[in-house]
A protein has these predicted regions:
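Gly/Ser/Thr-rich phosphate-binding loop
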Residues: 98-101, 110-173
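Alpha-helix/helix-capping structural signal
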Residues: 32, 104, 130-131, 202
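AMP-binding/adenylate-forming
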Residues: 25-48, 52-110, 148
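Short beta-strand-to-turn element immediately C-terminal to the catalytic PLP-Schiff-base lysine
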Residues: 28-30, 159-164, 192
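Conserved ATP-binding/catalytic segment of the ANL
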Residues: 190, 195-228
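Conserved adenylation A10 loop of the ANL superfamily
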Residues: 11-27, 228
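Active-site glycine-centered loops adjacent to acidic/histidine catalytic or metal-binding residues
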Residues: 20, 129, 152, 213, ...
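Conserved pre-ATP/AMP-binding loop-to-beta segment of ANL
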Residues: 2-16, 46-52
């Protein structure tokens, strides 16, 4: 599947939610809403004219289309879209600066023969669609990558809460609890009875949105506990 950027920017885009807040839903984003979310995604991931994006995830979901692919197209950044293959990925990504990987993809890559000798310096990997474990973050940072575990939803925006790791020092600072949500925020947030509520211009709904995620804060950092 490819994306028709010109058509999308005229008509908007419908993506499928992951189903974490109930049955998977079709979420429509207008051209205006897309541009707003692009601005957050570009700034938060440091995607600029010198970047190159490799997309290996489904374009029907926000992670595949809204997180990096369309924002990069919006500013004329080269984008290559391929089907994920863990055995080919490390060769494919050598010429790119940004990619998005769910944790299952990240783990599959570490099990290939090429993993032990790979050098991921200059690559920024945003992880999401599921919880990203500390061992995966550490593994990719040890290979030279910048790793950004990211929390977002089709309903509230693809790039909302995340952390950025490029060294063991910051990992050790945050690794006091099991599942990181982040300390960088592109939405307003509050915790009510343990549940995360978010609001902001990326959201397709007005007012506060109940995410269904149970979280807690520790010194300005949000951590994930489970689902409501």
């Amino acid at each position: 599947m490819q994306l028709n950027y010109e058509k999308i920017m005229k008509e908007g885009l419908t993506v499928l939610s992951s189903g974490t807040t109930g049955k998977p839903k079709k979420i429509y984003r207008s051209p205006k809403q897309l541009i707003i979310s692009f601005q957050y995604s570009l700034a938060g991931q440091k995607i600029n004219k010198d970047s190159r994006v490799l997309t290996v995830t489904k374009l029907t979901h926000a992670g595949g289309s809204l997180l990096q692919t369309l924002p990069a197209m919006h500013i004329g950044v080269p984008v290559k879209i391929v089907t994920f293959n863990p055995y080919k990925f490390l060769d494919q990504v050598k010429d790119y600066t940004h990619t998005f990987l769910p944790p299952a993809h990240m783990r599959a890559i570490t099990k290939t023969k090429s993993w032990d000798t790979c050098d991921l310096s200059g690559l920024r990997i945003v992880g999401g669609s599921d919880k990203v474990s500390w061992d995966l973050i550490e593994a990719y940072v040890s290979k030279g990558a910048i790793v950004q575990p990211n929390w977002g939803m089709s309903e509230v925006g693809p790039f909302c809460i995340n952390a950025e790791y490029g060294s063991k020092t910051k990992i050790d600072k945050h690794k006091k609890h099991q599942w990181i949500l982040g300390d960088n925020f592109s939405v307003e947030w509050e915790i009510v009875d343990g549940q995360l509520f978010v609001s902001g211009e990326q959201c397709v709904y007005n007012g506060w949105f109940a995410t269904g995620d149970l979280v807690f804060e520790d010194n300005g950092v949000l951590y994930y506990k489970g689902r409501k």
